[in-house]
Amino acid sequence: MIIYKDLLSGDEMFSNIYKIRELEGGILLEVEGKRITRTEAIDDSAFGANPSAEELSEANEAAVSSGVDIILNHKLISTLYNKKQYSAYIKKYMKDLKTKLEETNPERVDAFVAGAVGAVKMILGKFKDFEFYTGESMNHDAMVGLLDYREDGITPIMLFFKDGLEIEKC
């Protein structure tokens, strides 16, 4: 399995269990998810009680969570931006990412800078369609994943900057 982690924060963003394709000339990765509902039962032994010694045993209710599998599986955290805030964030993020690329992958910098302009314009043009998610550490200087839905209104997709990710093989 391959885990895609945020280059700046180290947060796990998604894995290769999803359909992944490149957009905007390889600048963005589109990750296709699914809406899911999962039930997580609570193990009675975790409470240390002896159910046979109880007069009336109440069944523990299971915790039910539903949402997009990418978000639930990788513990992404919802965050809010208005267009002005996101514009300020993305400008700083692009600068930080360019600096990191200059250190780690200098031959990729020119292609990143050239492609990032178009990707950011596309994102700002569709700004009202997106929901925003940070990694588990909630580092707002790191990558913010963008949630949207396909034209069918059912299939969730998330966008991530490819150059802002590092790959970890498990």
Swiss-Prot record:
Q: Which GO terms describe its molecular function?
A: calcium ion binding
**Statement: the UniProt record of this protein carries the keyword Transmembrane:** no
> Start and end of every TCTP domain?
1-170
**Gene Ontology cellular-component terms listed:** cytoplasm
Q: Which UniProt keywords apply?
A: Calcium, Cytoplasm
Q: What is its main location?
A: cytoplasm
Kindly give the PROSITE patterns that the UniProt entry links to this protein: TCTP_2 (PS01003), TCTP_3 (PS51797)
Q: Where in the cell is it found?
A: Cytoplasm
- Record's keyword annotation contains Cytoplasm: yes
Q: Name one Pfam family in it.
A: TCTP
For this chain, the family text in UniProt reads: Belongs to the TCTP family.
Query: What is its biological role?
Result: Involved in calcium binding and microtubule stabilization.
What's the protein here called?
Translationally-controlled tumor protein homolog
Q: Which gene encodes it?
A: tpt1
